Amino acid sequence: MTRQMSLRGRKGKPGRITFVGSGPGDPGLLTARARTVLANAALVFTDPDVPEAVLALVGCELPPPSGPLPAATEQPAKASGASGTADTSGVADKPPAEPDPSPVIPGGPDVRPALGDPAEVAKTLATEARTGVDVVRLVAGDPLSIDAVITEVNALARTQLTFEIVPGLPDTTAVPTYAGLPLGSAHTVADVRGDVDWAALAAAPGPLILHATASHLPEAARTLIEYGLADNTPTVVTANGTTCQQRSVETTLAGLMDKAVLAGAGPDGLPAATAGALVVTIGRTVANRAKLNWWESRALYGWTVLVPRTK
């Protein structure tokens, strides 16, 4: 989304900072409050992995632009005769137009990436809010399920600024549900893209749900096996969860160390270039997928249907 400077919503007092969870991917799973905040947002700082379908909702209910129209451009006088001299007869000299002092308010939201470490992001949010602008911090997933965002919130809590937190549906529960994997009341979630207590994770009650990218999976699997998990523990890797591009691959914990398993050359595999975040479900619940795989088993799922039309 193109960055546009916007003067919408500027007030004499500090603005509100609203953390909004984007949910697992499907914009239909956003909360009603999240949709309202995003639709009226003029300034948004977003995570890079927020889906485009969610970003498309930003600012969709902002009022139309206001302010003066651009000044009309004076047309040059027409040439008269073959001499090429301008015909100025009957045209009085006009003084230059005075500029209109009223401010022009450009249309469209201002969407920027949330850059830097959590302290830097929090400082940026606070700086903008102190100018009187309402600021939205759009977070992939659920705000208070992400350590870095918790740090941002804690930093803002030490200021006098007003903030709000709009939860998002965590992908660590939504994606297994869309993959037909019931988690029950006891399960363990870990993001293996950062520091992990592997001994505690391997001993934790299952099923295990991991946040990872494809590059993290071999080492994560190898380490979990070293700490006592069986190498044949059933595992499902899901990409693009809750969207129409969702793909899940069933394998074992040892299978995560095999690049061919994740390459997904066949129609049931992962996209060949799976660069984004994956949700990995590990444990006996994988056995339920055969009968509870309601999303990816739908008729024509994953097909592109062309509808011919006459001219």
Predicted stretch roles:
Residues 2-19, 70, 101, 120, ...:
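A contiguous loop/helix-start segment that scaffolds small-molecule binding in enzyme catalytic cores
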Residues 7-70, 93, 98-114, 304-308:
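Glycine-rich, flexible N-terminal cofactor/catalytic loop recognition
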Residues 26, 140-205:
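Class I SAM-dependent methyltransferase SAM-binding "motif I" and its flanking Rossmann-like core
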Residues 46-47, 136-140, 163-168, 183-185, ...:
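General beta-strand structural signal in soluble alpha/beta enzymes
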Residues 51-53, 170-174, 217-218, 242-245:
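Short gly/pro/ser/thr-enriched loop/turn and capping motifs at secondary-structure boundaries
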Residues 81-93:
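Small-residue-biased low-complexity repeat regions
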Residues 114-130:
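Short phosphate-binding loop-to-helix
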